[in-house]
Amino acid sequence: MKLERKFYDRPTLEVSKDLLGKKLVHYVKGEKLSARIVEVEAYIGAIDKAAHSYNNKITERTKIMFGPPGYAYVYLIYGMYHCMNIVTEKDGVAAAVLIRAVEPVNGIETMANYRYSKPIEDLTKKQIHNLTSGPGKLCVAMNISKINNGADLCGEEMWIEADGYHNFEIVTTKRINIDYAEEAIDFPWRFYIKDNPFISRK
C-alpha cells in the first residue's frame, strides 16, 4: 500500500522510525525497482547544525526541505554521490529523513548492473552486501539522481509503500559523518533495523 501524504506530515523522528521496514519504489524504464528501508537519519533544520537548513536557512538547494511533506530531496555530495531524503512535517518546517541504507527486494539484477556494471551472479558476497548499504550506494543501485529532486512520493514514478513487514527491533544511535555539527553530533537521530546485513555500519 502506497503511503499517503499524511504519513509524512508528522514529527520527523516519528516518521523516521516508521519508515523502517517500508519499501522505497522507483520505476525505471518500465521496471519496478524496490528495496526495504533498513537505516535512516533525521534532520530538523530549526535546531540541527547537521542539517542543510539549519536555523531555517532557505537556499535554492534547501527550499524543498521547507515543504510540503512527502517529496524527495536529492542532493550531491563530494561532487559524485547522491543522497535521497524524504521531506517531513507541515509546509514551512525545514525537516527531512535521509535514507541511509536499503535491502533489495525487486530488480536486484538491474541494481547490480547500475552499481557494478555486471550481472548479480558475478558478484561476490561482499559486493552483494555492499550493493545498497549506504546513501550513495543505494542511489546508484536504484538510479536515483538530482533529476528526482522534488519528486512527489505520492506520485506514480517513485513512492514508499507498506507491506506489513514489522517483525524487527529498532536500534537508536548517533548519526554518521557530521563531525562539523557541534552539539548536534550527539543527537540520537539515526535509526536502523537490528542485525540487518545491509546497514551501513553498526
Swiss-Prot record:
<comment type="similarity">
    <text>Belongs to the DNA glycosylase MPG family.</text>
</comment>
<dbReference type="GO" id="GO:0003677">
    <property type="term" value="F:DNA binding"/>
</dbReference>
<protein>
    <recommendedName>
        <fullName>Putative 3-methyladenine DNA glycosylase</fullName>
        <ecNumber>3.2.2.-</ecNumber>
    </recommendedName>
</protein>
<keyword id="KW-0227">DNA damage</keyword>
<keyword id="KW-0378">Hydrolase</keyword>
<dbReference type="GO" id="GO:0006284">
    <property type="term" value="P:base-excision repair"/>
</dbReference>
<dbReference type="InterPro" id="IPR036995">
    <property type="entry name" value="MPG_sf"/>
</dbReference>
<dbReference type="Pfam" id="PF02245">
    <property type="entry name" value="Pur_DNA_glyco"/>
</dbReference>
<dbReference type="GO" id="GO:0003905">
    <property type="term" value="F:alkylbase DNA N-glycosylase activity"/>
</dbReference>
<keyword id="KW-0234">DNA repair</keyword>
<dbReference type="InterPro" id="IPR003180">
    <property type="entry name" value="MPG"/>
</dbReference>
<dbReference type="InterPro" id="IPR011034">
    <property type="entry name" value="Formyl_transferase-like_C_sf"/>
</dbReference>
